Amino acid sequence: MKEQQHIFTNKMLRTLLIPVIFEQVLNSLMGTVDTMMVSNVGSAAISAVSLVDSINVLVIQAFSALAAGGAILCSQYIGQKNHEMANKSARQVLFIIIAISVAVTALCLLFRVPLLKLIFGKVESDVMTASQVYFFYTALSFPFIALYDAGASIFRSQGNTRGPMTVSVISNVINIGGNAALIWGFNMGVAGAAIATLASRVFCAVVVLWQLRMDRQPIVVRNYRQIRPDGKMIRRVLALGIPSGIENSMFQLGKLAIQSSVSTLGTVAIAAQAMTNILENLNGIAAIGVGIGLMTVVGQCLGAGRKDEAVYYIKKLSVLAEIIVVASCLLVFVLTIPVTKLGGMESESARMCFHMISWITVVKPIVWTLAFIPAYGLRAAGDVKFSMITSCITMWTFRFCLCVYLIRFRGFGPMAVWIGMFTDWTVRGIVFSLRFHSRKWLKHKVV
């Protein structure tokens, strides 16, 4: 098949993927900058940010999954050239997101102290105090990051990834500048980091909602106050979003459960694991950008009735993602020691971090891509329940149980987390590869 016969040319793919990859890297850097700047305040601060962010990511991933469910509908309607239904889908995504995010924020603010104590148990008192402060401000940002996720997903479903990228660039400037002023200038510690993040997320939400009003795109959303619930469309969005939301939430709940075991190892181990999580995220985030772009590509291909194209692009972009993972792992490995020194980590925490990153650099390029990238394409085809079931089983069986066993019964340190992770990745990769080659995922009808 020649390139001109494909729905997406290589140039179109570059235009789609480069901004979304760049955006994902920038979003990841926001959390990295928070942690590195706070790390100079002390181990208690970096531990607090790490612990609370594990809750924040759980909530934000659930919002992202709901937004992605709507984006699947939008992209398939765009592929069909049915812009009216794409617009209706977009309006309902925004309605669902704002309703749920406001409710979640209210619950988190009301119960933040017992929630933190329930999840993290007997952490050191200074860590718990800093965690309560950080969680208060970041919980306030949930509706804003949720609205941004919804708006950005709607833009990506149309193939417009440059707009969200531009917003992310400015948002990161706001976050970094706010961190510098509030953490170092006003000595506000974790509160300063959280307030800077809140400000950047408010900016993101306002700008993306304003951009959705423009006439230059297939999907245009105005009169936000006049959006009313459409039961049928909401059910369709939720049918795609809830399984992905459960999958993402179970994934993050597993991380929280694992974090409870890691928290028993002491502040040095918590700090080492926190920095390792950040660095591991950095060496995979660009490839995740490819996966997010793949959802748009597969959705539009299937909306246009081109199943052969969907298969072709999953293969093609999986190869691209693997190249990115290899390069990213090598880069992060080289930068690990300088980053731990720049972050002011204690020597023992830095040593443990480097040991874990060394193993990640070896294992991740072998198994990670097949475990995650094809799944984005399968979800865009509507195969969300299979992805949810597979991910939940492998995560709880291998990642969680193995990790807890190694820490609590075999005396392992934080490396146990990554042994469980590697096992999970390997099994996921095998299962999703078999599912992809079976072609059963192509039998779903989304629109």
Name each region found by the language model.
Residues M1-V20, C74-S141, G185-I242, V298-K364, ...:
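Short alpha-helical transmembrane segments in multi-pass integral membrane proteins
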Residues Q4-M36, N40-V41, V57-G69, L73, ...:
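N-terminal transmembrane alpha-helices
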Residues V25, L29-S47, L116-S125, A181-M188, ...:
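Helix-terminus/linker motif at the lipid-water interface of multi-pass membrane proteins
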Residues I46-A106, I145-P164, I270-T336, W368-C392:
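Small-residue-rich hydrophobic transmembrane alpha-helices
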Residues T15-D34, Y137, S171, S200-C204, ...:
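Transmembrane helical elements of multi-pass membrane transporters/channels
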Residues S43-S54, S131, F135, A194, ...:
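Small-residue hotspots at the loop-to-helix junctions and early N-terminal turns
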Residues A67, Y137-R156, P164-N172, A193-V208, ...:
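Short runs within selected transmembrane alpha-helices of multi-pass transporters and secretion channels
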Residues Q24-S28, Q61, S101, T105, ...:
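Residue-level hotspots within the lipid-embedded alpha helices of multi-pass solute transporters
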